[in-house]
Amino acid sequence: MSEEKLPLLSPLNENDIENDYKDENLKSDLDKLSNVKKQSIIQRFKDYLKNSISKQTATVLVYVVLYILSGVINSLLLKKVMNVFTNYGFFLNQLTNYGYVPIFGAIVLYKILFTNDIPKDTRSFPQWKFVIMGALDAVTGYFVVIGGIKTTGPLQQLLNQSVIPFTMLLSFIFLKERYSLIQLGGALIIIGGVVVSLIPSLTGGNTSGNMLFYNFFYLISMIPYAFSNVYKAIGFSTVEDMDVWYLQYFDALYQSLVGTVLFPINNWLPPPSDMKFNQVIPQLKAGGKCLGGINTLIEQYNSTTGELLPTSCNYGDNLGCDNCHGAWVVVLIYMAVNVLYNVFILLVLKHAGATVFSIANTLRLPLTNIAFSFKFIMGSDSNPFSGLSVAGLCIILLGLGGYRVGSMIKQKKEAAASADSSSNTENKVIPKVFPTQFGEVSIIIKKKVPPKSQTHLRNQFFGKLGITVPESKLRNQNSIYGDQ
């Protein structure tokens, strides 16, 4: 039985061609429909954003995101700079003080010569007030830089939040400020979170990068900073519109001068920040070399055996050796980011207000600590999370949230209690270029309300009685009693 052989190529009939043509058209139509749907979804999303978010809101969001981003980078770079200058803390303190004087001075000079932003009234502001503020900020900066050398980045961020309870206490004493139970509860929770964060240092556990003495040295910086906050509320309460660059220049100038005379404290500090009186000039010279990328403290080996000498750095408990390669690059980038960071603070405060600024500050804290744990960002300076560090972070965030909510509720109640509250109080925010950003506290400055005259009180009394006093009668009363 022979098999019927089929042709390799069977002829196509008209129906097959027509079906294939229809399939191709259908596929093309489906592709077009899919593209139309994708375009319509994207367009609808764009229209939604355009209708729901105004140009002003979008601008505020951009400023807030840039503030948070620059704040995180600023904290990371600061710790990088501290680690580079571990052996030259006093030099680093002078660098972070004097480094801003020419920058702010150039801006102020330009404004005085080519703009009207700094009128004569501003220039006549008492210099002694700048001196006091600069002195307080100098002490704060000194403790921050010296203590921060042996305090890890994540712990620095947590300790910064302790300025809130310190400022609340001093505001209660000097400004007669009263706080709600929610605010007090938030402050107590923050204190609890700080204590939890310090447990590894207190118990001698995993303290890589931390020294208990310098952890508390860093924590002490919150006290003069809290005093500075309160002083600004007192000394600058009469200032209507102080040019921020003018203020920053004189604050940085006096902070630098006062910071220079703080070197005797180093005489009693433990390594690596100890410095005898006769070592001040050599320390400054070695710090300057480190800024230029030249190592002074290097490993010393026995020429015969090749072993590390007991007197060498990196031997046992001796000081670590210098690692100054590219130090000037890190410092320049840090100072540039720090200035931009403070500009974004001003923009957020101006366009969004203190409430949004507080929320952004709260968001910045966990993001910074997370960034410190990434090795691809911090390299050998990274600090992996531990159970206690996570617990401390969560507790402090809970306390910050409580404090912020309590502050907003308190302000709303005060506004509702008095129709004139907006004219009697204001949030006075005086930015300050510090090496790091502390926990933010709203200082309420109470404006002085002028006393009411006798005429005003008489008219108010008659009005409550429903008596309308003729204007001619009022003029006679004014001439007899006079306004006081």
Swiss-Prot record:
The chain crosses the membrane at residues 58-78, 95-115, 129-149, 155-175, 179-199, 211-231, 245-265, 329-349, 356-378, 383-403. GO terms for biological process: amino acid transport. Residues 1-57, 116-128, 176-178, 232-244, 350-355, 404-484 are cytoplasmic. GO terms for cellular component: vacuolar membrane. It is a multi-pass membrane protein. Disulfide bonds: none annotated. Glycans are attached at residues 206, 302. Residues 79-94, 150-154, 200-210, 266-328, 379-382 are vacuolar. Keywords: Amino-acid transport, Glycoprotein, Membrane, Transmembrane, Transmembrane helix, Transport, Vacuole. InterPro entries: CRT-like, Transprt_Chloroquine. Nutrient transporter. Involved in maintaining the osmotic homeostasis of the digestive vacuole. Belongs to the CRT-like transporter family. PANTHER family: PROTEIN CLT2, CHLOROPLASTIC. This is Crt homolog 2. It comes from Dictyostelium discoideum. The gene is crtp2.
